[in-house]
């Protein structure tokens, strides 16, 4: 599994953080996000979760354009993604971090955007004694009829969760967000669900038409504060 790794140049050991990609896949925009976390003291792993589809899983910039060849190619890979294999990938990364002297022993963080929001929450439930903090940023369909829907395992989470939702998001509509709030409270899960008013799905990515800098910076503030509390 090809993984981009970023860490501070000096000091250490550092807490480990898993950054799980959104549907358009690995690109410089995500690497920059990993670097930003590295500058504040974290050892960041950014895996290419599409690796099972073969080597040709890096898409061109028009992957964001509806009807483009790259977007269709991405969707053909994306639609085959499910939670169980990704949980195996998380297990592989946990094994890796345990073997690195530059990584601080103890809790790990995990956050995901878009399609990986559910993966981050599922990882917190699957590995509750390892993942002390997890975040979903405009995660898609966090409540669904799927057998592996993240809402079904909220009660297994021991760490703290932060779930950020966009007001305008067809992949996480407001009725779903409200249902998730109810289920979140019922499960007694530690953390917060925050609705970002006036923004659209993808608002945290600087290269998107919907980028909203104030909301994106607040997202960074929330994420870093979460990791400071839970990982150090």
Features from the language model and the residues they span:
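N-terminal cap/leader regions of alpha/beta-hydrolase-fold enzymes
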Residues: 1-232
């Amino acid at each position: 599994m090809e993984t981009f790794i970023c860490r501070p140049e000096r000091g250490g050991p550092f807490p480990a953080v898993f950054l799980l990609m959104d549907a358009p896949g690995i690109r410089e925009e995500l690497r920059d996000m990993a670097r930003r976390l590295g500058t504040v003291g974290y050892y960041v792993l950014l895996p290419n979760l599409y690796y099972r589809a073969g080597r040709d899983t890096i898409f061109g910039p028009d992957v964001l354009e509806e009807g483009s060849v790259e977007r269709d190619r991405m969707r053909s890979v994306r639609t085959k993604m499910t939670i169980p294999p990704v949980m195996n990938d998380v297990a592989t990364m946990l094994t890796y971090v345990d073997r690195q002297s530059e990584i601080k022993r103890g809790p790990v963080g995990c956050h995901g955007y878009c399609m990986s929001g559910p993966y981050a929450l599922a990882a917190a439930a699957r590995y509750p004694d390892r993942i002390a903090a997890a975040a979903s940023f405009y995660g898609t369909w966090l409540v669904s009829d799927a057998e592996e829907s993240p809402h079904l395992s909220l009660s297994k989470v021991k760490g703290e969760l932060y779930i950020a939702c966009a007001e305008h998001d067809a992949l996480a509509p407001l009725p779903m967000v409200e249902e998730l709030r109810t289920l979140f409270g019922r499960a007694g899960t530690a953390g917060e669900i925050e609705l970002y008013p006036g923004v659209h799905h993808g608002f945290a990515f600087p290269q998107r038409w919907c980028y909203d800098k104030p909301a994106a910076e607040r997202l960074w503030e929330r994420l870093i504060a979460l990791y400071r509390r839970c990982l150090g």
